[in-house]
Amino acid sequence: KGKRISLGLRGQSDWGVYPRLLLKHVFGITPKNADIRHMTPGALTQQLIDGVTDAVVIPIGAEPNMKEFLIPGLVRRLEATGKKMCYLGVTKEDIDKLNKKFQATWIHVNLKPNTLPHQSKPLGIGVNRAYAVVHPTFSDEKAYKVVMAIAKIAPKMKELHALWRAWSPGLMTCGLSEENTHPGAVKAFKELGWWGQTKKCSPMTYPKG
């Protein structure tokens, strides 16, 4: 409280929406007791570099096994300045409180030291699962073909593009269940022999109402 906090735009889920929910409902931090600013990711990073804000939010990408991490370019910009970065983590109790409030399924994860630049100590973070399946309006045949097409090109894309580095069959199936996945997609996953991996993750759900 009482600090300058720079977040992403109000319409950006990971950069703006979720951090505001965490600040308000877990820490009691609101615009009434702190200087909360919403701006583009590039702008908030520059504010931290210039020393005109006290804290910023920086989402990172990961896969279900938490072995491959996608460090955003904005973190690399901060790293390039040579300035020391101080990470502010969250506890499992913090994330549990947020989940209870919004009927959500955020996950608490402890990052090992040196997962992120200048991270010398373990860091607790809240993980928001990116969840995607074939749209329910697709026919069974189209849903099947979409999954099969991705399964075919993904291994090569993993070698060609940094964003695909975190891809794995586990990434495609984490959070899926018979109830939330298109039947055509389920058929494809079963033929690929990947459906059994859904047991490694709890099914993705959304708040009711």
What are the residue ranges of the model-derived segments?
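Alpha-helix boundary/interfacial micro-motifs
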Residues: 19-21, 27, 57, 152-154, ...
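An extracytoplasmic/periplasmic, membrane-proximal ligand-sensing/linker region
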Residues: 60-82, 87, 129, 138-209
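Pocket-lining segment of extracytoplasmic ligand-binding domains
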Residues: 29-138
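Ligand-binding clefts/hinges and TM-proximal coupling segments of bilobed small-molecule sensing domains
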Residues: 11-21, 101-174
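Glycine-centered secondary-structure boundary/capping sites
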Residues: 27-28, 100-104, 193, 203-206
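Bilobed "Venus flytrap"/periplasmic-binding protein-like clamshell domains
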Residues: 1-52, 61, 168-184, 188
